[in-house]
Amino acid sequence: MSAGVRWKITWENDLEPSDHAELSEFFRATYGPTGAFNAKPFETGRSWAGARPERRAIAYDSKGIASHMGLLRRFIKVGDTDLLVAELGLYGVRPDLEGLGIPHSIRALAPALQELAVPFAFGTVRHAMRNHVERFCRDGISNIVTGVRVRSTLPDALPDMPSTRTEDVLVLVFPIGRPMSEWPSGSLIERNGCEL
């Protein structure tokens, strides 16, 4: 991100309706090129797609919102172990800044993650993002955990659809209060809620 970027780390309750409207427009513009389905949750002015974030890191520059990442504390189950994490998600970076956002978003959120006193932060990305996140992992801030599937509830319970989905995604783990060696082993992560 350029030097002209300012970060706003905010609690969800502190966002105004105008903030949600601006974020909704940002997500439609950011996610729309990846497929109309990806932008659909934001058509009604919502600034979240599944689970609603607890805190947000929002980068602004002279053109408006440059980048966004949300976080939500939750218990997940990794194998047989219940684990408190800060889930990171709802990530977006304006198309003209692609490739510059994730490391800056994590660094901006670092004080909030420390304040929340979670042992780990975790997030998931599509396999198509592997090269991008591998570059990011070289800094040692994050680790890619492979061979793990993630099971989540769907945002809407429909009578003719399953209530959960299991995905083969890349899992990123960020050691916050504990070393990576303490991340539990397991081939399935139960999110026990909607993806952020």
Swiss-Prot record:
Annotated Pfam families: NodA (PF02474)
Localisation per UniProt entry: Cytoplasm
Functional description taken from the UniProt entry: N-acyltransferase required for nodulation. Acts in the production of a small, heat-stable compound (Nod) that stimulates mitosis in various plant protoplasts.
GO MF annotation terms: acyltransferase activity
Protein family: Belongs to the NodA family.
Intrachain disulfide bonds: none
Lineage: Bacteria, Pseudomonadati, Pseudomonadota, Alphaproteobacteria, Hyphomicrobiales
Cellular component annotations (GO), alphabetically ordered: cytosol
Gene that produces this protein: nodA
Record key words, sorted: Acyltransferase, Cytoplasm, Nodulation, Plasmid, Transferase
Record keyword Acyltransferase present: yes
Superkingdom to which the source organism belongs: Bacteria
Entry's EC annotation: 2.3.1.-
Listed name of the protein: Nodulation protein A
Organism expressing this protein natively: Rhizobium leguminosarum bv. trifolii
